[in-house]
Amino acid sequence: MSESSRPAVVLSHRSYNAKTGLAIVCPMTRQVDKGWPFTVRVDQTSGIIADQVKSIDWRGRRARIKGRVDLAVLEQTITTFSRLILPATSA
């Protein structure tokens, strides 16, 4: 990994990742107490920045799996991102 490597959570399915060599990710941060509305907390010291979705060449970057997040955290990340792209529904 290069010095510029940063942790990220993969949103895309492994079949997409394998076929394309790309992965759709959200970066992680340690700045969880900033009050950013689109940061999903993973634990006391880290969060996922759900409004910074990126497509990366994981093969070219030699990305490696470092860990996993709970399914509930992944679902919350996707829900948080979807608020940016889907129209609000009236209750």
Regions found by a protein language model. Give the residues of each.
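Conserved functional hotspots at enzyme active or ligand-binding sites that engage polyanionic ligands
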Residues: M1-A91
